[in-house]
Amino acid sequence: MYQLAQSNLWTGRLDSETDPTQFRHFQTVKFGDLSQLDFSDEHKGVGLLGYAIDKGVELNKGRVGAKEGPNAIKRAFAGLPDLNQCEEIIDYGNVEHNHELLIDTQREFADLAAKSIKRHKQTFLLGGGHDIAYAQYLATRKVYPESSIGVINIDAHFDTRDEGYSTSGTSFRQILEEDDNADYLVLGISQGGNTQALFNYAKEKDIQFVYADELLHQVSPPIKDMIERFIHNHDTVMFTICMDVVDSAFAPGVSAPAVLGIYPHTVFELAKRVIPSEKVKSISIAEMNPTYDSDQRTAKLVANLVHHCLI
């Protein structure tokens, strides 16, 4: 169910009402209704769309609460300074789950997200469970029906479970099983967070991955080269970040906290190596769970990640 943006989420410290160099995002954000827009190609500005859904997390036997993530992220983002004043940012609201099956909600979200991806230079999709990734893929494939798609995921988990239905742990298996023209690269894999069956599937499907242990201190030149080659080898790139990849000391508000996760600055550096590419039209950020957050640390981390990628 599509819900329009809530303007009351967008508040913050007011430093000036007249000097744009002192403006914050709550002063410059605009609001839009994707249901009223056609499938047009404009390639300007940035779109925000929330995936206020954690049904996939529930189906994956995780701890729920991520459906409140999009609004928590927007609240935290609203008060950050607008340092990229040349790019218009439009909040298109959220999609909520009210269908019998999760896949039907994913398709509804995909239809709306596709309009934003088509219309804007980049679209940030805010979750919500990581089942957002399959919806993001459906949207990407709608916009680019013939293109090769490179899926880059910063995540502690492969999320390639074989369940026979959509959950937060099945998105990338669904993509690979349905699309011979899609490939998958995962950065941040936890050796303690994936079964041998998932590693076997990764080998079977030629999934490229980097362990979290390899990203503890810096992004090494071989990993940088791997990312660059992967982007180069595909027509379009779908980028997604699961916040459970970040160590729980920095990101307690997630569906599945990481005991040995990677540091926020490493995620920022990885993102900065992906997002500047013109092939990246959509970025999803998943599993931000306000129920378990502390002092809004995780919401602020996600907000700063989006902010960091815009400047």
From Swiss-Prot:
Pathway: Amino-acid degradation; L-histidine degradation into L-glutamate; L-glutamate from N-formimidoyl-L-glutamate (hydrolase route): step 1/1. Its EC number is 3.5.3.8. Keywords: Histidine metabolism, Hydrolase, Manganese, Metal-binding. Pfam families: Arginase. It catalyses: N-formimidoyl-L-glutamate + H2O = formamide + L-glutamate. One of its GO terms (molecular function) is manganese ion binding. The keyword Aminoacyl-tRNA synthetase does not apply. Binds 2 manganese ions per subunit. Mn(2+) 1 binds at residues 130, 155, 159, 242. Gene3D superfamilies: Ureohydrolase domain (3.40.800.10). GO terms for biological process: L-histidine catabolic process to glutamate and formamide; L-histidine catabolic process to glutamate and formate; putrescine biosynthetic process from arginine, via agmatine. Its cofactor is Mn(2+). Mn(2+) 2 binds at residues 155, 157, 242, 244. Coiled coil: none annotated. InterPro entries: HutG, Ureohydrolase, Ureohydrolase_dom_sf. PROSITE patterns: ARGINASE_2. Catalyzes the conversion of N-formimidoyl-L-glutamate to L-glutamate and formamide. PANTHER family: ARGINASE/AGMATINASE, FORMIMIDOYLGLUTAMASE. NCBIfam families: hutG. Belongs to the arginase family. This is Formimidoylglutamase. It comes from Staphylococcus epidermidis (strain ATCC 35984 / DSM 28319 / BCRC 17069 / CCUG 31568 / BM 3577 / RP62A). The lineage of its organism: Bacteria, Bacillati, Bacillota, Bacilli, Bacillales.
